[in-house]
């Protein structure tokens, strides 16, 4: 019987989901393994003893982080005490690099092994973080093959586990059945809206999406809109911004993407999820002007959408800051729906993404890495 324990640390909804899948795979591999950590509802449901609720920690942008500093500091102090009083056999840090790299240092100080799952995007900015990774991380579990090559070059132990989204199960229901379930007409165009999972994203992006929707309706009166609400968000948070024509459902992205003809999405992991299902999309984003200005100084990339970053060529138009207007969004969605040649060229490009990211079940692959680290 194993008396080993693993701490899973996730600070955002996407990390909470990865942590939940990893927890399930670990329990299958080693049923008596004790799992605790920082996360949200998904990790709790997967049997993780969550002693730090991460819901308030999912922020983006420098100014936004300052506003949540008290909650972030409290979480850090709680983990630091846990490392000293109840040291686990391994800590798995999932994404969330600003917080997690700092806590990786504290874990190593306490003599605990460290696995980092989902690499910080050091290939995009702050490459200097490689020094911390070399010093405080025992093993990297990465989602992209080019990241594996990067860490091999830097002599950091690494496993390319594949991207979880590339191996996600597809809905068993037919398109007509899903449309019936959502009370939508399968013969009319459907546009999916993804305004993000953070409150600040919702406040900035959803009003624009709603206005864009009204403009699209003037051109395509039969268009239908559907919004899958992120698990960490209550309907009350978005209700003030909604218009009657938008159908809101609770966290059912896979079914939504199975019926959508196009999507409007906040920049983030969801852009890759949409792209992998070959749904043409437009990416929008707005942050505080100072945050954006600093980002442009620090980040040496032409794109911010994950689907564009991992593709050999751009697969989605990005509308950022002042370029993100209801009219610009509506114009691009109209092209994605009505310009046949343009639409087909985008779908063709999207089809090349999955093969380069699929390595089987990513959670099971990471679970094997965890098992090797704690039992070796």
From Swiss-Prot:
GO molecular function: lipid-A-disaccharide synthase activity; phospholipid binding
Organism encoding this protein: Coxiella burnetii (strain Dugway 5J108-111)
Gene name, Swiss-Prot/TrEMBL: lpxB
PANTHER family: LIPID-A-DISACCHARIDE SYNTHASE, LIPID-A-DISACCHARIDE SYNTHASE, MITOCHONDRIAL-RELATED
UniProt record, GO biological process: lipid A biosynthetic process
Protein name: Lipid-A-disaccharide synthase
Keyword line: Glycosyltransferase, Lipid A biosynthesis, Lipid biosynthesis, Lipid metabolism, Transferase
GO cellular component, one term: membrane
Reaction(s) this enzyme catalyzes, per UniProt: a lipid X + a UDP-2-N,3-O-bis[(3R)-3-hydroxyacyl]-alpha-D-glucosamine = a lipid A disaccharide + UDP + H(+)
Transmembrane segments: none
């Amino acid at each position: 019987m194993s008396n080993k324990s693993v701490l899973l640390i996730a600070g955002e909804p996407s990390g909470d989901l990865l942590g939940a899948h990893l927890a399930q795979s670990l329990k299958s591999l080693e049923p008596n393994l004790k799992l605790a950590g920082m996360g949200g509802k998904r990790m709790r449901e997967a049997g993780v003893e969550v002693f730090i609720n991460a819901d308030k920690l999912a922020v983006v942008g420098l100014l936004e982080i300052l506003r949540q500093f008290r909650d972030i500091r409290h979480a850090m102090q709680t983990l630091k005490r846990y490392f000293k009083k109840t040291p686990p056999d391994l800590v798995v840090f999932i994404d969330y690099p600003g917080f997690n790299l700092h806590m990786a240092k504290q874990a190593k100080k306490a003599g605990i092994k460290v696995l980092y799952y989902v690499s910080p995007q050091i290939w995009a900015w702050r490459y200097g973080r490689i020094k911390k990774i070399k010093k405080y991380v025992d093993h990297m579990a990465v989602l992209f093959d080019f990241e594996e090559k990067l860490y091999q070059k830097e002599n950091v132990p690494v496993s390319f586990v594949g991207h979880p989204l590339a191996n996600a199960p597809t809905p068993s229901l037919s398109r007509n059945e899903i449309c019936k379930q959502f009370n939508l007409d399968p013969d009319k165009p459907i546009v999916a809206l993804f305004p993000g999972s953070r409150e600040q994203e919702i406040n900035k992006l959803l009003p624009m999406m709603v206005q864009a929707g009204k403009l699209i309706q003037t051109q395509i009166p039969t268009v239908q809109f559907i919004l899958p609400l992120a698990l960490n968000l209550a309907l009350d948070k978005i209700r003030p911004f909604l218009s009657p024509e938008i159908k809101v459902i609770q966290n059912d992205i896979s079914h939504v993407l199975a019926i959508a003809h196009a999507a409007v999405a906040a920049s983030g992991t969801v852009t890759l999820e949409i792209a992998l299902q070959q749904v043409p999309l437009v990416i929008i984003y707005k942050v505080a002007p100072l945050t954006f200005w600093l980002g442009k100084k620090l980040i040496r990339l032409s794109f911010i959408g994950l689907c564009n970053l991992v593709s050999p060529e751009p697969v989605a138009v990005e509308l950022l800051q002042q370029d993100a207007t209801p009219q610009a969004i509506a114009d691009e969605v109209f092209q994605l729906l009505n310009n046949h040649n343009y639409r087909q060229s985008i779908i063709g490009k999207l089809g090349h993404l999955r093969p380069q990211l699929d390595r089987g079940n990513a959670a099971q692959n990471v679970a094997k890495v965890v098992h090797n680290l704690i039992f070796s």
